[in-house]
């Protein structure tokens, strides 16, 4: 099976779907002020045609209700600028392209469009037709839009996914050189970490180059993705997954060869690596860069119905929080896990993820490290 066929969130609306388990809204709270500033500066710059039709691409939109959280924030930010101007100019039409891989569950996304349009008219007074939303399926590591056609590109929690598993993780004899690991983790040897960094450098450079061509001069890009910060020792979702798969091997429920042959195309860069790649590629100016961390159980509600939870308030809360974390991790990685290990292993794996999540939460290290970076396309010399 081709890698891109399983590189998507768990679709549908079931208990293990991404739509039911994502805590995306909690992360957007941190991103929203930077998003608003990007939109405001774009509109005030009077770029070509922006006051007639504001063109936006959301790269890696995933599926479910969370897809429209960013769209709503973008629309509200645009309209906020119009209100501040206090003039009679009509608000620009907004054209938004939702992008993800072809296997993304776009059906569940567009089933929500009618209610989104109704809420938009109710909350923002925008008539249907003044905000146009469509799909642009395909890899965001390839061309998606015509040259100099877009004003703003946004991507949230996607760019840590690589275009492919790095080369060099298996010898010519088919022996894994990343034993016991599923990505470039702290336990990986330096050559493995370099292979993942090289692949990220190649992919992120391609991403910047291609999408700089799609943006108009001085167009903006806002990116948020997981990162690693040396001063914090926060195991991320991949670390939880790696620990839990190793537990299954130790307990005899999974063959070691299955673990050693499982390499996930994910890399969490440092902020220094991100800055270096942006500067070396050269198309963008870094306007803003911030790191933050959010708790594993962001979005958790004690009212959520997790089966089998204890009746003791304290242990019940701990069990439910850990179960919530396991559900989120499963909703992200289930397609690629099922493809490699088979679906039968998923319930046991989820149980072990919850156990490991509970340990990390008790240790006070249950946080995801993230980076927000705001970029502006450098103007051509003729535009300066």
UniProtKB/Swiss-Prot annotation:
Gene: DXMT
Enzymatic reactions: theobromine + S-adenosyl-L-methionine = caffeine + S-adenosyl-L-homocysteine + H(+); 1,7-dimethylxanthine + S-adenosyl-L-methionine = caffeine + S-adenosyl-L-homocysteine + H(+); 7-methylxanthine + S-adenosyl-L-methionine = theobromine + S-adenosyl-L-homocysteine + H(+)
Protein name stated in the entry: 3,7-dimethylxanthine N-methyltransferase
Pathway assigned to this chain's UniProt record: Alkaloid biosynthesis
Family: Belongs to the methyltransferase superfamily. Type-7 methyltransferase family.
Co-factor binding comment: Binds 1 Mg(2+) ion per subunit.
InterPro entries: MeTrfase_7, MeTrfase_capping, SAM-dependent_MTases_sf
Tissue expression summary: Mainly expressed in leaves and fruits (grains). Also present, at lower levels, in roots, stamens and pistils.
Known role: Involved in the biosynthesis of caffeine. Catalyzes the conversion of 7-methylxanthine to caffeine, likely via theobromine as an intermediate.
Binding locations of Mg(2+): 178, 260, 262-263
Single Gene Ontology MF annotation: caffeine synthase activity
């Amino acid at each position: 099976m081709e890698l891109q066929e399983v590189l998507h969130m768990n679709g549908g609306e079931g208990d293990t779907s991404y739509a039911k388990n994502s805590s995306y809204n909690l992360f957007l709270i941190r991103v929203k002020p930077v998003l608003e500033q990007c939109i405001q500066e774009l509109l005030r710059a009077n770029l070509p045609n922006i006051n007639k039709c504001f063109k936006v691409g959301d790269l890696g939109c995933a599926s479910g209700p969370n897809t429209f959280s960013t769209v709503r924030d973008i629309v509200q930010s645009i309209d906020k600028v119009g209100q501040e101007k206090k003039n009679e100019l009509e608000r620009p039409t907004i054209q938004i392209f939702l992008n993800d891989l072809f296997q993304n569950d776009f059906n569940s996304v567009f089933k929500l469009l009618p209610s989104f349009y109704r809420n938009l008219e109710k909350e923002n007074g925008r008539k249907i037709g003044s905000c146009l939303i469509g799909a642009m399926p395909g890899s965001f590591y390839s061309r998606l839009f015509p040259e100099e056609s877009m004003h703003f590109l946004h991507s949230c929690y996607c760019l840590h996914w690589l275009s492919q598993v790095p080369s060099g993780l298996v010898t010519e004899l088919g022996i894994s050189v990343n034993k016991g690991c599923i990505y470039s983790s702290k336990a990986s040897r330096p050559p493995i970490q370099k292979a993942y960094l090289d692949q990220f450098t190649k992919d992120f450079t391609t991403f910047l180059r291609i999408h700089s061509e799609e943006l108009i001069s001085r167009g903006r890009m806002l990116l948020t993705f997981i990162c690693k910060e040396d001063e914090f020792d926060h195991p991320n979702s991949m670390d939880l997954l790696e620990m839990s798969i190793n537990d299954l091997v130790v307990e005899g429920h999974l063959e070691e060869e299955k673990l050693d042959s499982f390499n996930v195309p994910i890399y969490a860069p440092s902020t220094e690596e991100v800055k270096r790649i942006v500067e070396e590629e050269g198309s963008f100016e870094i306007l803003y860069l911030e790191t933050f961390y959010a708790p594993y159980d962001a979005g958790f509600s004690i009212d959520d119905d997790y089966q089998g939870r204890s009746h003791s308030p304290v242990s019940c809360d701990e069990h439910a929080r850990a179960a919530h974390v396991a559900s989120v991790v499963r909703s992200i990685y289930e397609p690629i896990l099922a493809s490699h290990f088979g679906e039968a292993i998923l319930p046991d794996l989820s149980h072990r993820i919850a156990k490991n999540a509970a340990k990390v939460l008790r240790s006070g290290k249950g946080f995801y490290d993230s980076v927000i970076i705001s970029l502006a396309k450098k103007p051509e010399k003729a535009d300066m």
